[in-house]
A protein has these predicted regions:
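Iron-sulfur cluster-binding electron-transfer modules in prokaryotic oxidoreductases
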Residues: 1-142
């Protein structure tokens, strides 16, 4: 742990974007996507999410970052905190499902590899829960 602590930054980058749910497209809107910002990345390297949002906006993509999305759940899952992980998974599935019904998402994007991998497993994780499995499969198809 001592070696890992030495790798931690002594200060964190300043966040440049406002904490909002909708980042509108510049010019003609051609798509609407949700972005999973990641619980660690948005604190350690917020410039990655900020650059992603600016790039998408510049190319006519509206970006939705739902405030209800806390974490993809993989961190809790890897730490063995299964109840917390399942709470994160369930929250995300329901939030994105409702967001899609509300305004038709063209995609759910993650620029964090661990989160992206976890999202693809939601349907499998809830294979015994018909309602969540159906919603998770819909989310996977977006």
């Amino acid at each position: 742990i001592k070696n890992m602590i030495s790798l931690m930054p002594t200060s964190f980058p300043k966040k440049l974007l406002k904490n909002q749910e909708i980042y509108p497209a510049k010019g003609k809107k051609i798509a609407r996507v949700a972005l999973l910002t990641g619980c660690v990345q948005k604190e350690i390297s917020p410039q990655i999410n900020e650059s992603t949002i600016r790039l998408l906006n510049r190319h006519g993509v509206e970006v939705v970052v739902p405030k209800k999305i806390r974490c993809c759940g993989s961190l809790n899952h890897h730490l063995g905190k299964n109840e917390d992980a399942h709470s994160d998974f369930t929250n995300n599935i329901k939030t994105w499902y409702e967001e899609h019904k509300k305004g038709n998402l063209d995609a759910i994007l993650s620029n964090t590899s661990g989160c992206g991998t976890t999202l693809k497993d939601y349907g499998f994780i809830f294979r015994w829960d018909d309602d969540l499995k159906k919603k998770a499969k819909k989310i996977e198809q977006i």
